[in-house]
Regions:
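Adenosine-phosphate binding glycine-rich loop
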Residues: 53-146
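Rossmann-like adenosine-cofactor binding region
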Residues: 2-83
Length: 146
């Protein structure tokens, strides 16, 4: 179920899945609020405090080198400060999806996942959408380069 909450702390404490997609410049997700078995998905900037990352049983990323290069998330800043090292990364999403590594091993594990995406993925998705729109003869042409 998805519910609108008035109290951020209560919402996080009671959530199995926490997804952050904001432009926050300060952390608002506290490590003390994360319950056992939770999945934290950070897709943007500095929403989570360092303890959310360090307290996680597993750290999963989509593209670790890209995350470190972009310096746009908590874990990237931590890596630049030497607080997270390459060997601290449990798995990449690709390794889990291909079966090379496991995701959750038990219901109590706290998993932190950082996703920055990749240009090639954006290109693949938009190409698929474009082709589908052509096939269905829907959409609106927008003069982009005028």
């Amino acid at each position: 179920d998805i519910l609108i909450a008035d109290d951020l702390e209560q919402a996080i404490r009671e959530s199995d899945i926490i997804i952050t997609v904001t432009l926050a410049e300060e952390p608002f997700v506290k490590a003390a609020w994360i319950k056992r078995g939770a999945l934290i998905v950070q897709m943007a900037t500095l929403e989570v405090e360092y303890g959310v990352v360090t307290n996680a049983d597993k750290i999963v990323v989509d593209f670790w080198d890209t995350i470190k290069h972009r310096m746009a998330s908590t874990i990237a800043v931590m890596a630049s400060e030497g607080l997270v090292k390459d060997e601290d990364i449990s798995a990449s999403l690709g390794e889990i999806l291909s079966g090379k590594k496991t995701g959750r091993d038990n219901d109590d594990q706290v998993i932190y996942f950082n996703s920055v995406g990749a240009g090639i993925l954006d290109l693949a998705v938009t190409t698929r959408c474009y082709r589908e729109a052509l096939k269905r003869n829907v959409g609106t042409w927008v003069p982009y380069w005028v």
